[in-house]
Amino acid sequence: MILEHVLVLSAYLFLIGLYGLITSRNMVRALMCLELILNAVNMNFVTFSDFFDNSQLKGEIFCIFVIAIAAAEAAIGLAIVSSIYRNRKSIRINQSTLLNK
């Protein structure tokens, strides 16, 4: 695959995730958009590692670290969302101002 095609696809994924993160009012949707952004970053790591330095696996190792961090982030985020839903009966971002009270 051509480098430019992969970078354009990764940029589209990143921008879709960023747009969704900025405009979403649902916490679960915001977490999904954050995962989309992290997957676009992973795509860039693997692409640049494949195209520019085949002898070392630095991009793939960074990708594995990002996947591990994203899994931990998703688990913690969903635990927080379920706790907020149990207490507030809503997962909308603008209704869950826990620090104001």
Swiss-Prot record:
Gene Ontology biological-process entries: ATP synthesis coupled electron transport; photosynthesis, light reaction; ubiquinone biosynthetic process
Gene3D superfamilies for the chain: 1.10.287.3510
GO cellular component: chloroplast; chloroplast thylakoid; chloroplast thylakoid membrane; plastid
InterPro entries associated with the record: NADH_UbQ_OxRdtase_chain4L/K (IPR001133), NUOK/Mnh_C1-like (IPR039428)
Enzyme Commission identifier(s): 7.1.1.-
Compartments (UniProt record): Plastid, Chloroplast thylakoid membrane
Entry protein name: NAD(P)H-quinone oxidoreductase subunit 4L, chloroplastic
Species per Swiss-Prot/TrEMBL record: Arabidopsis thaliana (Mouse-ear cress)
